[in-house]
Amino acid sequence: DGTMTSEISARIAKAGGVFAAMPRNVFAIRAMAKSVKLRVYSASVLAVLLYGSETWNITAADTKRLESFHNRCLRCMFGISRLTHFTNFDLRKLTDQQTIESKIMTNRLRWLGHVMRMPEERMPKRMMFTRLQTARPQGGTRQRWKDCVQHDLRAMGLEDGWSHLVQQRDKWHSATQG
């Protein structure tokens, strides 16, 4: 059907499996430093959850499902009950974590930079700039990857001059970090 919903469901299921497979008390150890817990979580659970996210064009509903899973994991890791009045904003502040949406945005822009620096004859670069000759259907057309990237560039304030900035890898990297 052209949506990412089934892929998102699979990613959440796989990441949930990784989280559940962690040794029972790895995240429950109070003496373990917050930074260590977050590094383990990032290297294992988030890596599985966001695998391939640089190519996703997801809906707001899919983003909400990913955010919800991420917040549930963080709450579990730090022993924060859902009954406690602790907002998701407070949770991100405590854990110094970005939203999943901004992580996906960063991944998409990183991939854009990688492809833009490729030689012209490389297939990913050729495909990025290929236009299909068929018209898009009217009404309710789905957002394309290119549309997501345009939104990401606007959100990062990189609408103007990004095509020159992208050629300077270090500057592009620091400009696109959420």
Mark where each language-model region is:
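Short linear motifs embedded in intrinsically disordered, charge-biased segments
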Residues: 1-178
